[in-house]
Regions:
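Helix-to-loop junction immediately C-terminal to a conserved catalytic motif
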Residues: 51
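Conserved ABC ATPase "signature" region
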Residues: 97-111
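Conserved ABC ATPase signature
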Residues: 115-122
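Hydrophobic anchor residue at the start of the ABC signature
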Residues: 129, 168
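A short, flexible loop at the N-terminus of ABC-type nucleotide-binding domains that lies
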Residues: 1-26, 55
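Catalytic Walker B motif of ABC-type/P-loop ATPase nucleotide-binding domains
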Residues: 140-144
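Q-loop/switch helix immediately C-terminal to the Walker
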Residues: 73, 78-93, 98
Length: 189
């Protein structure tokens, strides 16, 4: 899995104020970055910049490999079954065959036919993570991935992240909650 992610002297402006400036780091295959800081300092904005959804005021972001984003929103059609909602996104990446394994990996295979609107908060969060798994992207951008998850689900998340890194993937995680990312590069805002 060939992947890299680099921030070079990146500055972020939101709401007329600079959240961070001159930010630089490089993540290579198998590495993780842990973005931490209090609410409102730009953790989510950093993830959005990495995803290409927000342009930096200055500097640039470079990288190799497709990126998969887990944001606050699950980005799943509430009226479709869980499998169909994930299938839509997986189809964009020509990876519909990966949906079943992704649902199994997050412990939701038994409710694949349930409409997304009926899922609990934790189930929706795991479903959103299944979307990342099914994408096959080597670079994962995870914004508050543990929100709404119980202890067992956090353990599953940590195990999947570790396996992805062991396979040469990159993970950039923004969180204010404790999450196990051994050897992660700390990016404090």
């Amino acid at each position: 899995m060939s992947s890299s992610l680099a921030f070079e002297n990146v500055t972020c402006l939101r709401g007329g104020r600079i959240l961070f400036e001159g930010l630089g780091f490089v993540l290579a295959a198998g590495e993780a970055g842990l973005v931490q800081g209090p609410n409102g300092v730009g953790k989510s904005s950093l993830i959005r910049i990495a995803a290409g959804l927000l342009a930096p005021l200055g500097g640039r972001v470079r990288g190799d490999g497709a990126r998969a984003l887990l944001s606050e929103s699950a980005a799943l059609d509430a009226e479709r079954s869980l499998a169909a909602a994930l299938g839509f996104w997986a189809g964009l990446d020509q990876r519909t065959a990966a949906v079943g394994a992704a649902l199994d990996a997050v412990g939701l295979a038994d409710i694949a036919d349930v409409p997304v609107r009926l899922l609990s908060t934790g189930q929706r969060r795991r479903a959103a993570f299944a979307r990342v798994l099914a994408s096959g992207a080597p670079v994962w951008l995870l914004d508050e991935p543990a929100n709404g998850l119980d202890t067992a689900s956090i353990g599953m998340l940590e195990a999947r992240i570790a396996a992805h890194r062991a396979d040469g993937g990159i993970v950039l995680v923004a969180t204010h909650q404790p999450i196990g990312l051994p050897g992660a590069r700390e990016i404090r805002l």
